[in-house]
Amino acid sequence: MNATPIEQLVAAQRQFFASGRTLELAFRKQSLVALKKAILAHEAEINAALMADLGKSATETYMCETGMTLSELSYMLRHLGRFAKKRRVLTPLAQFPSSSFTVREPYGVTLIMAPWNYPFMLLMEPLIGALAAGNCCILNPSAYAPATSKVMAQIVAACFPPEYVALVEGGRAENQALLHQRFDYIFFTGGVTVGREVMRAASETLTPVTLELGGKSPCIVDETANLRVAARRLAFGKLLNCGQTCVAPDYLLISRKVKDAFLPLLEREIQRMVGENALVCDSYVHMVNEKHFRRVCGLIDPDKVIFGGQADERTLRIQPTIMDRVTADDAVMQEEIFGPLLPVIAYDSIDEALAFVNNREHPLALYLFSEDPALQKRVLASVPFGGGCINDTIVHLATSRMGFGGVGHSGMGSYHGKKSFDTFSHEKSVLKKSTRIDMPVRYMPYTPLKDRLLRVFLR
């Protein structure tokens, strides 16, 4: 039986990896430099593609896609030598005379599957980690962002031979064909349903995975919060990419004592950002397609809308919408919204708010607005979540110095900066023993003296 093109591609990458070329630190750095130059050279095309796919302005594209990718590249180039160094560790006395060290080695041929909401950044940032660690890589962008996919294919082709890095475009058929191959590592960003499929396929070959998923990320505002700042930063987090962000504040839990004062401030901040009519705002992103547009519109309960609620299917835009008096049984609380809707739930005690969050799947993010240090400490200690902010939203992921990832239902594994390097490499532990002295304690026959000596060494 003849091999399929995807099978041939995987085989070619295995052969290239076996050559040892990617193990050279200089080669890895050259690859990252080439990628950075290509991104800068294609910046205008990237801007145009993201405008076509999502209606992203050039400013938001640089802030959330191109700029973050370039920053990650710069960070990795500065620190790669340190990340890749052999690390010496202490050796226990029982192993005398010997030395111990760990080395990081690449997995081999990796697969990176990216979503449509940040189609450039969420493909390129994992690629940076894969290349820095010395892997070959097959990239699989989302078919829902075709213009961006096309530009990324041009960038990859300009930088790398396909036996080193290749981009496979297509839809579900191509995704399934890729998952039928044996990879050495799979990195997936997307929804829980497809994440399960990826993990199921990976389990057939015991392939390690990173799953960057999502969930309903709460925003908690207590009575001590700076309400004006909280309103502005919550509006930013919700409106960014029109709410199509895996770490967007999904719903608001607010102290009943300050709810009536806070909501008008939130409405005012939204209007400052997108104007009186967001449907005609040039800075405001649109829904990715009709299917997603209709799904989000279907979550709007007109009886509970206190702000917004209008939509334009022709432009795929939905107004920022606040829904008050929402209950846990409402449709908008049954799934991740992934759009510009904000359900509001008032609480009478922080215990009530924390119980509400903990009775659901672990969120990818949590945001707390509070000036109470004791409450801040309590929330961090009592709620499992991937990552988050105190007195801000979303910006915790905009750094290469902390890992980003989920926990439980919101994902497994993390990346960014050194975490990316570690994710795409295996830590090999080595003990080097001298042959000049060979302690007889461990060898048979065992005696009372050997037993006493072992108890001295191993305690």
Identify the function of each model-found stretch.
Residues 1-101:
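N-terminal Rossmann-like NAD(P)+-binding subdomain of aldehyde/semialdehyde dehydrogenases
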Residues 17, 21, 36-39, 43, ...:
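Structural signal for hydrophobic packing residues in well-ordered secondary-structure cores
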